[in-house]
């Protein structure tokens, strides 16, 4: 399996090698009458600096997550609004006691040399949807979102995003904002990295990656991928397979790598390298 994208110093200082965390498996006896429907869980760790949200097996999540600084700016409050019941653990509460599909959890900031995940979301084996908004205007403590198997959709927003989103297996659609990282995983994924200064990797499968403002690092990995740079100085990697790369405007670097690739530089002073294979290389 291909390597996932990594953060770079100073903003992306922490190298991420994130695996999908084990999902909670509820204990139930087949055929037991009146068995309780398993719920998602939200709980801050005992050191108060990281919130973990876990879906139950078999759930379809449609979650909206908002991150905002506490009044004294010493921590972050995450409000998670889903369509499934959530069990509120340590440092989490229901804003409306009658609605157990929405929780608010507060984590305390820590003094760390490197960026760290203040929120870890592990969704499960269905077609899930997550909308994440970072309203903290910082990305040192970021969100790490694993969508799990299934055809999932994630959308990140905010002046600064900074989230790390992993699609895992399935045909996923990932949209990340400024400073966001994305990894499609196995499947035919679509990754929109238009916020600026993004790192995105498609993973195994025939993927489509699109850049936007500022510089992007976009890699297709295994499969026949199509990659579009944006308006900045982008670096595009095709990976294994017959790939098509479009630099568009800006001084771009395009690397087809192995396979019969097509590289189109677009306006700007571009560097084009087809790699092994029967390649088509065109510079405007």
Q: What is the role of each PLM region?
A:
Residues 1-35:
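Secretory targeting and sorting signals
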Residues 35-89:
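Short linear S-[DN]-x-LW-Φ motif typified by the pepsin-like aspartic protease active-site region
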Residues 73-119, 216, 261, 267-284:
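Acidic, glycine-rich low-complexity repeat segments characteristic
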Residues 93-156, 174:
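Right-handed parallel beta-helix
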Residues 123, 132, 147, 156, ...:
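Glycine-centered beta-turn/loop sites at beta-strand termini
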Residues 127, 151, 171, 188, ...:
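Consensus positions within tandem repeat domains that build extended binding/scaffold surfaces
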Residues 127, 136, 143, 151, ...:
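Residues at the loop-to-beta-strand transition
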